[in-house]
Amino acid sequence: MWKFVIGSVSTAAFFVSVCTIYFSVSMLDELDSFRLSIRDELEDWKEVSDDTWQRLNDMTSRNVPKKTNILKEFVRGKRNVGNDQCNCAEPTKNCPAGPPGEKGSLGNPGQPGPDGVDGDNGVDGDVVIHDMPNPKECIKCPAGPPGPPGPPGPLGPRGDKGPSGPRGALGDQGETGPVGEIGDQGPPGSAGRAGPRGQAGQPGTIAIVGLAGRPGPQGPLGEPGAQGEPGVDGKDGALGAPGRKAENGRPGKRGKDGVAGVPGTRGKEGEDAGYCTCPPRTA
């Protein structure tokens, strides 16, 4: 049972891992394609904005009339102080912007004209201090095209610990597990506390002794009683008359051999019998 459950869980985890890797690779591919498309669109937009900016500069330089001031070269104006003043062109008044015309081709340089007739002497001029326009009324230059995206910044500091999340919902009740094996017998428990004293009983009724009834029927035969103790020996009886002579009995069995006796003393030497003498030795 457990082996089947573990195998099923392992197989499911393997398939989930494979699916996760596949979708991660697909997502990275889509993000790369999206990044390339965004970069192409930004380059197209940059080209359009650069072209528009060039056309605006050409229109401004072509439509704004040039004003010459003879005294400007000899009179020193006030210096610009601060960063609020811009270096844009002088403002034009009552000059509506016309529609942009098509850019023509460059013509050939013309021949230098003849020298003009000397003019009359002019009136002595006064020293004029040229005031710059009020910085608050300075012309706002149009914003340039957006630059390319900068490199990713460094990793920021670790944020504060967020608040604790809400407590999760109560899970469903699990299935009842199989009945376990019977455990070993535990040690005897300690004696319980004495129970409370019972309530007093109700008062009994006064009994009235009735008349004796008729004797009942004879009961069944009871089981045999236990064996009694042996009785006391009786007194010896009177001596009886002698009996008749009995016949001889059968011979008894042979008894066992007795223990060996002590060895006797050596007897005296007997006399020589009629033996011949032995011949002498030859060798």
Swiss-Prot record:
Keyword Ubl conjugation among record annotations: no
Compositionally skewed regions (Low complexity) per UniProt: 185-204
Stretches for region Disordered: 90-283
InterPro entries (alphabetical): Col_cuticle_N, Collagen
Mutant phenotype after disruption: RNAi-mediated knockdown causes dumpy body shape. Defects in cuticle integrity.
GO molecular function, one term: structural constituent of cuticle
Protein function: Probable cuticular collagen-like protein. Nematode cuticles are composed largely of collagen-like proteins. The cuticle functions both as an exoskeleton and as a barrier to protect the worm from its environment. Acts downstream of the Wnt signaling pathway, perhaps in the formation of the adult cuticle.
Family statement: Belongs to the cuticular collagen family.
Name of protein: Cuticle collagen 49
